[in-house]
Each structure stands twice: as structure tokens, then as C-alpha cells.
Amino acid sequence: MADVPRDAKSALTALYWAAVHAVAPGASLRAALERVPMQERGRRVWVIAIGKAAHPMAQTALAVLAEWNRTPAGGIIVAPNEEAAPHPAVEVRAGDHPVPGPRSLEAAERIGLVAGRVREGDEVWVLLSGGATSLAAAPEGTVRPDELFQLYDRLLGSGLDITQMNLIRKRFSRWGAGRLAVALAPARVRNYIVSDVIGDDLAAIGSGPCVPDPSTAAHIHQMLDSAGLWNELPLSMKRSVSGAERDPSLETPKAGDAAFAHVERRIIASNRVALEAIEARARTFGYEPRVLGAALAGEAAIVGRRLIATLRSYCDQDASSLSGRTGRTCLIWGGETTVTLGAAHGRGGRCQELALSAARELAETAGLSTAALLAAGTDGRDGDTDAAGAIVTRDTWRTIQHAGRDPSRDLASHDSYPSLDAAGALLRTDLTATNVMDVVIAVCGPPADDKRARLTPAVALEAIAGSLRRLKE
């Protein structure tokens, strides 16, 4: 068995990596492709991979095809970074993220060229992961690229949650709202998905390129209006929405469209799987883990305060329990918070803002002297920074102050990165090639230093059972 970390920070880092490894896109896709019946493995196959996990997913898909003695008919990989093409028939394009740009436009155009070569009787593997919306962004209809990109930028600071943002973005996107499935029809489509949205809503993941759009123009109008964005929209977007409100034939593709009759969709990795992996690993460290949900949402700073209050409550319960608990509490959440930006803001991401807010609460809350919290994106990037998130303790807030920064001011101005960097609290992992939203882990105390507390038969059986559940899904 691997060595158990000696302190809470090291334990949290190990738990983060347990989550990331559990949702490795390549292994997850291989498990899904192995379920394809032998009699269905004879079609001509195209590979379209879009998202942060596009490279490992495409590489696995091509490896499986080779094992089936098949050669890909063609395809494209659209990812945040360019790598060598894994096969001569498959091209590679780098898109822009988190805000789309010229490379995104080019990638979207190349997807169209690949889709135009697909014929009836062919099969297309659409491999989708987080970031797809931005990486392959191009406008639909009369909307100009600069108008689409400005909308994306405004949405990031609007306070709308990720599901609402996706509903709006795909309305104006060339490949969103089921339009890729329409372009590929009548070919058979196998859509394999690494979910990066709360609730694993297929229509929201990557703007739902192969899924009917459940929203209506009236719904989009209402959301834009409530966020104060409707009056800022360019005329082309207003006309698109208003026209569909008046004439249903101008709506986005809906359920019942013939294009979706030959589409099969499967989520192969999700935040829930990542949280289960954290839970299983935490038990081997001697913690009493509890998964408190995969739907964490709301303003990051407010959520950070709330989670520390929850941690205090559980730590008190476990410390006073007579039921044989170790007193080493581990609380686990998944999801994606938001940050509503003002006119002027600094550097950081939602996980860093949550962590900085939590650091203040830890410093001001009695009874949490050994507590620590990690908030990080499973993709290895939090906002437009080089950090995945941060790990904070009771001492983080004072360390920032001693370094000459005002953490209260930084928190209020959404400038969490410099404060956390000054305290050495940032978690830098580089890109992980997966994305199942964020994970937040809070612990009371370091891991157990007693091997018996770390891995009892009950703990081992629970970990094995969790692994078996994931394999069966």
C-alpha cells in the first residue's frame, strides 16, 4: 500500500489526484467501447474529439480501432493545445479557452469540413469533454464572430450558473443545440461524454452538439433579461431570439427531429465518480469521509463561508462521538460555483475565491486549528491562471497579511490569486486532460499515523465495493 501522507495538505493533494485518476478519459472511453457488440464493429468510423480531454480520448479511440483491425475514415481533434496527430487521417487543431478566439473559429470550420465528408452508413464517434463550447466556437446564422465572443465574455462575469450560460451560448453557436447531429445525419453517431456540468445534463455538456435543445427562445430571452444582458445584445442576436419566439420553425433542433434517431449517448466519466474515488481513498488515510453532494453552486465567496460552518459542525460531532469514529472528519463536495465580477477585478478563479473566503473563516472560527480545505478544478486550471485551485488552513489568512497583502481587499475585488500565491497556498498541477467540474475537500486533522486506523477490513471492503460499482456503470 502507498505511504500515507503525514499532514493534511499532503493528504488533500493526494485525494485530489485520486479524483483526477478516477475520471481518466482514456480508460473510461476504452471501457465504454468494449461494450460495442461485435456485429456493430464493421462500419466505416470517423472520430471527432472536442474538449480538454480530446487528445487522450482520440488516442484511445484510435487504439481500439486498431485492435479491431480498422482504420479511421478520418476525423479531427480540437483541444486547448496542439499535439502530434495520432493518425494521418485525423487532423489536430487547438482552440481558444476559456474565451473563444480566432483559433476556435478555425477549429469550428474544420469540424464542418469533416462532417461534410461523412456519408450514410458511416459511424461517427463524437468524443466530448469540458471546454468544447469555447474551443470550437463559431456563430450561427447572421451573428458575427466578434458578437459571439463578446457575449461569451459577458456571460463569464454575469453571475449566471454554468447551465444557464450553456443554454444561452449554444443558442448562437454553430455546433451547439444538436446542430452537429443534424450535420452528421443520417450517419450513426456514438456520443461519448466526460461530464463537466451539475446533474450530468446531456443538453448542457459542451453545448449539447448531439442532443436536442430543451430550451425555447422565450426562455433564453427571459434569462438574458434577468441578467441585465438583453439590452446589451447586438441586433443580430435579438433578431435570432425574437424571430424564433414568433416562428417555431426557426427554433433550435428539438426532440423528435429525425437527426437524433441514430444518435447514442453515454456519459463515461463524471463528478460523482471523482467524489467516490476521494471517499474511498480518504478511508485509507484514516478519515471519516462524507460526500455531501455533487451540486455545489452559488457565489464562490459565500459558498466558502458556508462550507467552513458545515465543517465546524461535523468536526464537533465527530470529536465528541462515542461510536468509534476517529475524529478525523473529511467532507467532500463537487460542482461548480460562480463569481459575479464588477467593472474592475483582479486575477483568480472561482476555486481560488472560494478558498480565500474559507481561509478567512478558518482564521476566525474557534475549534478548527487542524482543519484544511482544498478547492480545485479537475482540469488543472482555475480561471485564467496557472493554478488548479488552492489549499488553505487556519494560518493562511495571517500568512497573507504578513506578506504585505490585504486579503480582505483582494477577496472583495476578486483578486484571490496574489493573496494565495503570497501564502504558498496555490495548487499547481498543470493540465490534467480531463474535466468533471470542481472538487472541494475539507478535513479536520492530519491523516492517521496508525496503520490500523487507516485500513480496517470494513474500510477495504468499502473501497472495493466502490470500485466495483464504478466498473459496472
Q: How should each PLM-predicted stretch be described?
A:
Residues M1-I48, P56-M57:
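An N-terminal, well-structured beta->alpha segment
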Residues I48-A49, I76-A79, W125-G130, N191-V197, ...:
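Short beta-strand segments
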Residues T60-R70, A89-E91, P139-Q150, L184-P186, ...:
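A glycine- and small-aliphatic-rich helix-loop capping segment at beta-alpha/alpha-beta transitions
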Residues V78-E120, R169:
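Glycine-rich oxoanion-binding loops at beta->alpha junctions
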Residues G112-A204, P209-P212, A412-D415, S419, ...:
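Glycine-rich, mobile lid/loop segments that gate access to catalytic sites or pores
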Residues V143-L160, D213-G228, A344-L373:
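Gly/Ser/Thr-rich active-site loops/lids in small-molecule metabolic enzymes
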Residues A187-R190, P212-R306, T310:
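Accessory alpha-helical/coil subdomains and C-terminal extensions
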Residues L356-K472:
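Internal helix-turn-beta structural module
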